[in-house]
Swiss-Prot record:
FMN binds at residues 13-18, 60-63, 106-115, 142. It is an enzyme of class 1 (oxidoreductase). Residues 7-168 form the Flavodoxin-like domain. One of its GO terms (molecular function) is FMN binding. FAD binds at R383, R413, Y414, Y415, S416, G445, I446, C447, T448, W623. Belongs to the NADPH-dependent diflavin oxidoreductase NDOR1 family. GO terms for biological process: cellular response to oxidative stress; iron-sulfur cluster assembly; nitric oxide biosynthetic process; positive regulation of nitric oxide biosynthetic process. It catalyses: 2 oxidized [2Fe-2S]-[protein] + NADPH = 2 reduced [2Fe-2S]-[protein] + NADP(+) + H(+). Residues 224-491 form the FAD-binding FR-type domain. Pfam families: FAD_binding_1, Flavodoxin_1, NAD_binding_1. This is NADPH-dependent diflavin oxidoreductase 1. Gene3D superfamilies: 3.40.50.360, NADPH-cytochrome p450 Reductase, Chain A, domain 3 (1.20.990.10), Nucleotide-binding domain of ferredoxin-NADP reductase (FNR) module (3.40.50.80), Translation factors (2.40.30.10). Its main location: cytoplasm.
Length: 623
């Protein structure tokens, strides 16, 4: 695939949705012979912006209306990221007036700061620096309750395809022809059977070409900010009879470096696949076995996606599958877009060519069907993995050299720190993801399964992420901490940091004797006067009479808490699972402001809450 600095596709992605849609757009442009630059916003070289004429951005939002981490991720030797360059105050207001741009935001209206990520980019790039819009910014909503798909009942993919259609329509009308060998010819779409070869792919290394690396010892190169930790404690803190396994997980730096972190900061953990799953994948693609342990290198440089967390050495197919390839994830559209042409092995088909054609057609349908219902029913509903898809479609014979193009890269996972500043151990509180699907198959989260398997003394790769959630001016302000379940994790760090002498902690779980995590410590803090503790148990009425959820306790304490918020500038910190809980807490908080805060109506109460969010006095960290 050729690249050009004139047309640029950038993405900011936290969970992979924006990356996947940007990949599809890039794929479509290449098939129409539009050379372009394609990378994350953080990987884009600011110096190239003066050569850019058409800028297409797809970006999600994370945390408190923040841009995804790969927008600010600084890699290589560049002194600044593209975004940090754009934020410089001395830039002229017409800096980007040579650019025509189109933006797509992906968001979830259940979060207070819906699509703030793309709005920040739009405000700076278009409003303040003069870029021209090809068409109005599109905003997709996971809930279909706001944005461009409001009230349609359609998912975010419907907004993406509207965006793609507009982008292609513009480019094809602007450039209906292209030059080939000095001749002007009509622009036509590439034959769908042709695979788009990536700029850099794998090949057998000339060095040690006849060797096989069978040792399990590996190292990771190319990421200077990567750290190594040693596991000190990994114990279950929910009862054995409870369905949810929650771990107290402690580790320390192997070089005994004292880590510097604050309440609200997170740890980035780099997981890997199991050896059993890697063997399963190789058994499915049995033609890989012969070279699975031979040394490999790249034809043209290491892809940027592999630099975060370091590249495994020795670099073999087996090690890449274990440490970098996320083949146990649910496949996205771009996976099918790239692999359907490899359904070629008729020798495995009981019905011969007819069955092969059926498999090819179905895979292609998953790649191109815009309503995506079949893809959702086949992959998302049963949480079917890429490996299971390959085990279903046995005609697919994948070329190993493109493995890092069609398989997604394992993304690191982020966990809130539970320990207090200065603790030599970094402590996490981790809910192990394990459940059964409609297929009655057990599913496990790749990172929590990795953590659950770790033994004391084993090593992990990690980084620290400073989020600066709790501001210095909040020191000694009253704090209301609300955290059901493992939402308690970052709140523990707040209490341990002793940044306030007036803390109310509202904790919720199902049962007092099953999943009341850190019960002894919380009650000890209560006895010593460090916190006012209010615990609710949703399935245990005997121990929680009249109070089922954290929002019930919030309402019961409404007058007292509202007084602290309105008259004493208290900070409200909400943590836990996204979905109904944060919405219900927010609605309860608004009702409290109306009843006890002297706000006459809903609008004035909401306005006050917005001001709290703006000044970071109402903090919502949900996942």
């Amino acid at each position: 695939m050729s690249s050009s600095k004139k047309i640029v596709i950038l993405y900011g992605s936290e969970t992979g949705n924006a990356h996947d849609f940007a990949t599809i757009l890039s794929h479509r442009l290449h098939r129409w012979h539009f050379s372009h630059t394609f990378c994350s916003i953080g990987d884009y070289d600011p110096q190239d912006i003066l050569k850019c004429r058409y800028l297409f951005i797809i970006c999600s939002t994370t945390g408190q209306g923040e841009l995804p981490r790969n927008v600010n991720a600084l890699k290589g030797e560049r002194p600044v990221t593209f975004w940090s360059f754009l934020k410089r105050k001395n830039l002229p207001s017409n800096l980007l007036n040579h650019i025509q741009t189109a933006m797509l935001g992906l968001g979830d209206s259940s979060y207070p700061k819906f699509n703030y990520g793309i709005r920040k980019l739009h405000q700076r790039i278009v409003t303040q620096l003069g870029a021209n819009e090809l068409f109005d910014r599109l905003e997709a909503d996971d809930q279909a309750m706001a944005g461009s798909n409001k009230g349609t009942g359609l998912g975010i993919e419907s907004v993406y395809f509207e965006y793609e259609k507009k982008v292609l329509s513009f480019l094809l009308s602007k450039y209906p022809n292209r030059k080939v060998n000095g001749q002007i010819i009509k622009r036509e779409e590439l034959d769908p059977e042709v695979y788009l070869e990536p700029a850099s792919y794998l090949q057998l290394s000339d060095e040690h070409a006849n060797e096989k690396f069978t040792s399990t010892k590996v190292i990771f190169e190319g990421d200077e900010s990567l750290k190594v930790g040693r596991v000190n404690i990994n114990k279950r803190i929910t009862s054995e009879g409870h369905f949810q396994d929650v771990r107290q997980f402690k580790f320390s730096n192997v070089d005994k470096i004292q880590e510097n972190y604050e309440p609200g900061d997170t740890v980035t953990i780099y997981p890997c696949n199991t050896d059993e799953d890697v063997s399963r994948f190789l058994a499915n693609q049995s033609h890989w076995l012969e070279i699975a342990d031979k040394p490999l290198n790249f034809t043209s440089g290491v892809p940027n996606d592999l630099k975060d967390g370091g590249l495994v050495r020795p670099m073999t197919l087996r090690n890449l599958l274990k440490y970098h390839c996320d083949f146990m994830s649910i496949p996205r559209t771009s996976f099918f877009l790239k692999i359907w042409t490899f359904a070629t092995d008729v020798t495995k088909m009981e019905r011969g060519q007819e069955q092969l054609n059926d498999q090819r057609e179905k895979l292609r349908q998953f790649a191109t069907d815009q309503d995506m219902q079949d893809l959702y029913d086949y992959c998302n509903r049963p949480r079917r993995s890429i490996l299971e898809v390959l085990e279903d479609f046995i005609s697919v014979k994948l070329p190993w050299k493109y493995v890092l193009d069609y398989l997604p890269i394992i993304k690191p996972r982020y966990y809130s720190i539970s320990s207090g500043p200065g603790d030599p151990n970094i402590e996490l509180t981790v809910a192990i993801v394990k459940y059964k699907t409609i297929l009655r198959k057990i599913r496990r989260g790749i990172c929590t399964n990795y953590i659950a398997r770790l033994q004391e003394g084993e090593q992990i790769r990690y980084k620290l992420q400073n989020n600066h959630i709790i501001k210095k001016e909040f020191l000694n302000k009253p704090m209301i901490l609300v955290g059901p379940g493992v939402g308690l994790a970052p709140l523990l760090s707040v209490v341990k940091a002793e940044i306030s002498k007036d803390i109310k902690l509202l904790f919720g779980c199902r049962y007092k004797d099953k999943d009341y995590i850190y019960k002894d410590m919380l009650e000890d803090w209560f006895r010593k006067g460090k916190i006012a503790l209010h615990s609710s148990f949703s399935r245990d009425e005997e121990n929680s009479p009249g109070v089922k959820y954290v929002q019930d306790y919030l309402w019961r304490l409404g007058e007292e808490i509202t007084n602290l918020v309105v008259n004493k500038d208290a900070v409200f910190f909400l943590c836990g699972s996204s979905g109904k809980m944060p919405i219900q807490v927010r609605l309860t908080f608004i009702e409290m402001l109306k009843k006890w805060g002297n706000f006459s109506d809903e609008e004035t109460a909401k306005k006050y809450l917005k001001e709290m969010e703006k000044s970071d006095r109402y903090i919502q960290e949900t996942w």
